A protein has these predicted regions:
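Gram-negative (and chloroplast) outer-membrane scaffold detector with strong preference
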Residues: 82-163, 176, 215, 221, ...
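Extracellular loop and loop/strand-boundary signature of outer-membrane beta-barrel proteins
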Residues: 70-77, 113-122, 162-171, 205-213
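Serine/threonine-rich low-complexity intrinsically disordered regions
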Residues: 49, 158, 167-169
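Predominantly the C-terminal beta-signal and adjacent terminal strand-loop region
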Residues: 55-59, 65, 74, 170, ...
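Short acidic/His/Gly/Ser-rich catalytic and metal-binding motifs that mark active-site loops
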Residues: 51-55, 110-112, 153-157, 202-205
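Short glycine/proline- and aromatic-enriched beta-strand/turn motifs that initiate or cap beta-hairpins
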Residues: 32-106, 110, 225
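Membrane-embedded beta-strand positions of outer-membrane beta-barrel proteins
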Residues: 40-46, 101-105, 142-146, 182, ...
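Cleavable N-terminal export/targeting peptides
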Residues: 1-39
Length: 228
């Protein structure tokens, strides 16, 4: 078995970025509460994320699955995963327009199989953060957001070649993640529904194959939020 890097490594620059964002959020909310125009949301999402879809012009360099199909036959599953997502949003309203910051943590895991019996398991943890802009309508709050972040991923391969089998575990972190999203919140007093479509570029090099796999793609998510 070949191993690369620790499981879900935490880099110093990641800690600094998240800490700096949290400091900004704390200062931002502290100042705005004095004029009663600061809002915070805690959201829980689920839905579908298509790893094979082009992330809306952000760029994707995925050739890992195609390379495996050349040697191990057709992929038996599609490349859609079902992420679990938790989001935190802090923003300040000025009339019907609002802007602020957001932090999102998502995780997914899926096994893929090929026609010759080979297979792999892909697991990823994403931490995304950026800016959000809202229009506060009477019945819904459409929004647009963009930002950056990182993904940590683990891939476990079991690949057959004739009578031999190769098992490999690869760990990797992608620090060049970028995203943007469109969506809407439908409020019902302090809680409500949220729908969003997100486009994410996060290309990871698989060291065992010298190929790239997309960890982002296009997500269509639905969830609930609580405002406070």
């Amino acid at each position: 078995m070949v191993k690369f890097r620790p499981l879900f490594p935490i880099h110093l620059n990641q800690i600094i970025c998240i800490g700096f964002l949290w400091m900004l959020l704390t200062c931002f909310t502290g100042n705005a509460y004095a004029i009663d125009q600061t809002f915070s949301y805690l959201s829980v999402f689920s839905g579908s994320q298509d790893l094979s879809a082009s992330p809306g012009g952000l760029g994707s360099e995925s050739n890992y699955f195609e390379w495996l199909e050349e040697s191990h036959g057709n992929l038996e599953e599609n490349r859609k995963v079902q992420p679990s997502v938790i989001g935190f949003d802090f923003y300040r309203a000025s009339g019907v327009v609002a802007s602020g910051f957001g932090l999102e943590i998502q995780r997914y895991k899926k096994s893929f199989n090929f026609s010759d019996g080979s297979g792999l398991t892909l697991e990823a943890l994403g931490v995304l953060y950026g800016f959000n802009f809202y229009y506060r309508g009477d019945f819904w709050f459409p929004f647009f957001g963009f930002g950056t972040g990182n993904y940590s991923s683990k891939i476990q391969e079991t690949l057959y070649s004739g009578s031999s089998v190769t098992e490999t575990t690869v760990f990797r972190q992608v620090d060049t993640t970028v995203y943007y999203k469109l969506g809407a919140r439908i409020p019902f007093n302090s809680w409500g529904l949220v729908l969003t479509q997100q486009f994410t570029s996060a290309n990871m090099e698989v060291a065992s194959a010298n190929k790239n796999v997309a960890l982002g793609g296009v997500s269509s998510l639905f969830g609930l939020y609580y405002g406070f």
